Design a protein with these regions (language model features):
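Catalytic-site neighborhood detector that most strongly recognizes the C-terminal catalytic loop/helix
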Residues: 104, 208-233
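Basic, Lys/Arg- and aromatic-enriched nucleic-acid-binding interface segment
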Residues: 46-74, 196
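Short pre-functional
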Residues: 65-79, 101, 188-193
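Conserved tyrosine-mediated DNA breakage-rejoining catalytic core shared by Y-recombinases
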Residues: 2, 84-119
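C-terminal catalytic core of tyrosine-transesterase DNA break-rejoin enzymes
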Residues: 73, 185-208
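Short hydrophobic short-linear motifs embedded
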Residues: 1-29
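Short, polar N-cap/turn motifs at the start of nucleic acid-interacting alpha helices
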Residues: 89-93, 197-220
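C-terminal catalytic core of Y-nucleophile DNA break-rejoin enzymes
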Residues: 105-124, 137-165
């Protein structure tokens, strides 16, 4: 039986009615089936990703370099990325772990995070800047500001957005980037590099908790590219 779509009370949630029962699901589509407006793009040109990484490294801002590297590699929501602690990624002797587990704040889903070779190298480089005596519950991405008890606290999503906005302006990246950009960039390049492989699409859909693959295509920005390509082909037919 085809699903009928009804307007949800929460504009960010799509309510699907199947067999008389309502199911709520996170979706990149509005209740009328049209894409939601988005405040962030993926970084489509991998050269821009490298330029963003190098921008922070050359300024000696290894925390921000690590944010970009892990943000795109791990494909976590910004809140989950900023919740990572030293003890999550470093072992007792400060060795970088191969993987760790994290409960997603939005879904409470237990997520296994693989630390790839580039992320490992970035974590090893960043390790020299850490002042903690041992890997503990200190946030990995610490702010200069302290909490009410004088303890280190993580940077906020607002601070992350400001950091990225300033870098975008300096570098001249055309894509609009914000805290959502990391996940979208991960999905965009995974799909492109795989040549739209169905297994990759399914893995991304499952990992992002999307209701179907088209939602993932919209979220990643791939569908926009496909529409642009079709329009370009149409243009080639005209005189």
């Amino acid at each position: 039986m085809n699903a009928a779509y009804a307007k949800a009370a929460d504009a960010n949630v799509l309510t699907i009615i199947k067999g008389g029962k309502k199911e709520r699901t996170n979706s990149a589509l509005k209740s009328d089936g049209k894409p939601k407006a988005t405040a962030a793009d993926p970084i489509r040109d991998i050269a821009d990703v490298h330029e963003l990484q190098n921008y922070f490294r050359e300024k000696g801002q290894l925390r921000n370099y690590l944010l970009v590297t892990l943000g795109i590699s791990f494909a976590l929501r910004a809140g989950d990325l900023l919740s990572i602690r030293l003890m999550d990624v470093y072992g007792a002797n400060w060795e970088v772990k191969k993987e760790f587990y994290l409960y997603e704040d939005k879904t409470n889903k237990r997520n296994r995070i693989h630390i790839n070779s580039v992320s490992k190298q970035a974590l090893e480089e960043y390790r020299g800047m850490i002042k903690a005596e041992k890997p503990d519950t200190t946030p990995l991405f610490t702010s200069r500001k302290r909490d009410a008890d004088g303890k280190c606290r993580a940077i906020t999503i607002q601070q992350l957005n400001h950091i990225l906005a300033e870098a975008r302006k300096e570098i001249g990246i055309e894509d609009h980037i914000s805290s959502h950009t990391f996940r979208k960039t991960h999905a965009y390049h995974m799909i492109k590099e795989s040549n739209y492989d169905s297994q990759v699409l399914y893995a991304l859909q499952h990992g992002f908790n999307h209701s179907d693959i088209r939602v993932t295509m919209i979220y990643s920005g791939i569908e926009d590219d496909m529409v642009d390509e079709v329009k370009e082909r149409m243009g080639s037919l005209l005189i």
